[in-house]
Swiss-Prot record:
Pfam families: Allantoicase (PF03561). The gene is alc. GO terms for biological process: allantoin catabolic process; purine nucleobase metabolic process. The lineage of its organism: Bacteria, Pseudomonadati, Pseudomonadota, Gammaproteobacteria, Moraxellales. This is Probable allantoicase. The keyword Hydrolase applies. Belongs to the allantoicase family.
Length: 336
């Protein structure tokens, strides 16, 4: 069977620091849908880019990598309700119809609501995207101007058809209830995000904060081979400021291309803009001085962590280049 892979797609730069709140890896799930006869709705929440397998069929017809409904033979439209993996403010939507060429919806709209207890009875749905025309086999990026916090979304497709992937980009909203709980303060699901980086030729630093261990070498941050003096770096914001108790640096799958050393600098800043952080970061205090790396290994540090107050941002220095799969910063959320 011939398998076609989705063409490379570069997110608009403004979205590179945003989190996909509808990512199944952080707990996003389909609650209910009007119909998913041809392809299960949960597929459109998968992290992996869609594929097309030319000769793959199942009992319902052509297998498609996404959500696809049957052909509508009466008035109405199809819809799907999704519980976001984490609550947050929505900045943009990507309704991706890749490989849906003669079966994509004519148009789509999207609503959102805040229901922290997942009780949608009487939920007040707000329109996030008015009914908008869609095209075949392409990404549709829509910017959203709404400061509200949402937990659920409802995608409406008119009148029927298929969507390969739905991505809901935004900023994670963390409800702090326990300051004594130890969390990975850098994790994607806890609001960690990438701000800037020196290079991402083979793998984006946003992978560093993904859930779980890396599935392969592509699921990590990897830079090109350095042919000049210096080293590579990336700056990340913690989801919530806190005191760091344990650091993990995982080089899973990086065997001939792991860095020689890694160090971490840190700072606490309340109101700095992302643009201000980049030139300042080289002067931040060290949280972890340069440590030698091993291939395909989880490196754990506790006693090596230098004295510090609470931390809001870090700079990871990868010396001189190479690849890292994950970085974890375990600690407690600081009290205001």
């Amino acid at each position: 069977m011939a398998t076609l892979h989705a063409p490379a797609f570069e997110l608009p730069e403004i979205l590179n620091t945003k989190t996909n709140l509808a990512d199944a890896r952080i707990g996003a799930q389909v609650i209910e849908c009007s119909d998913d006869f041809f392809a299960e709705a949960k597929r459109m929440l998968q992290f992996e880019a869609p594929i097309f397998v030319e000769d793959k069929f199942d009992d319902h017809g052509k297998w498609m990598d996404g959500w696809e409904t049957r052909r509508k033979r009466h008035a109405g439209y199809d819809w799907c309700i999704v519980k976001l993996g984490v609550s947050g403010k929505i900045s943009a939507l990507d309704i991706d119809t890749t490989f849906f060429t003669g079966n994509y919806p004519a148009s789509a709209s999207l609503e959102a609501c805040y229901a922290p207890n997942s009780d949608l009875t009487g939920a007040k749905w707000q329109s996030i995207l008015e009914n908008t025309e869609l095209g075949p086999s392409q990404h549709h990026i829509f910017m959203v101007n709404n400061d509200a916090i949402f937990t659920h979304i409802r995608l409406n497709i008119f009148p029927d058809g298929g969507v390969a992937r739905l991505r809901v980009y935004g900023d994670v909203h963390i409800q702090v209830t326990d300051h004594e709980q130890t969390l990975d303060l850098l994790a994607l699901e806890n609001g960690g995000r990438v701000i800037a980086y020196s290079d991402a030729h083979f793998g984006h630093p946003r992978n560093l904060i993904n859930p779980g261990r890396g599935v392969n070498m592509g699921d990590g941050w990897e830079t090109k081979r350095r042919r000049a003096p210096g080293y590579d770096w990336c700056i990340l914001a913690l989801g919530k400021s806190g005191k760091i108790e344990k650091i993990e640096i995982d080089t899973a799958h990086f065997k001939g291309n792991f860095p020689a050393e890694v160090s971490i600098q840190a700072v606490y800043l309340e109101n700095a803009t992302d643009a201000q952080l980049i030139p300042q970061s080289m002067f931040w205090s060290y949280l972890l001085e340069a440590q030698p790396m091993q291939m395909d290994h989880i490196h754990e540090y506790m006693n090596e962590i230098l004295q510090h107050e609470k931390v809001s941002h870090i700079r990871i220095n990868m010396i001189p280049d190479g690849g890292i799969s994950r970085v974890r910063l375990w600690g407690k959320i600081a009290k205001s």
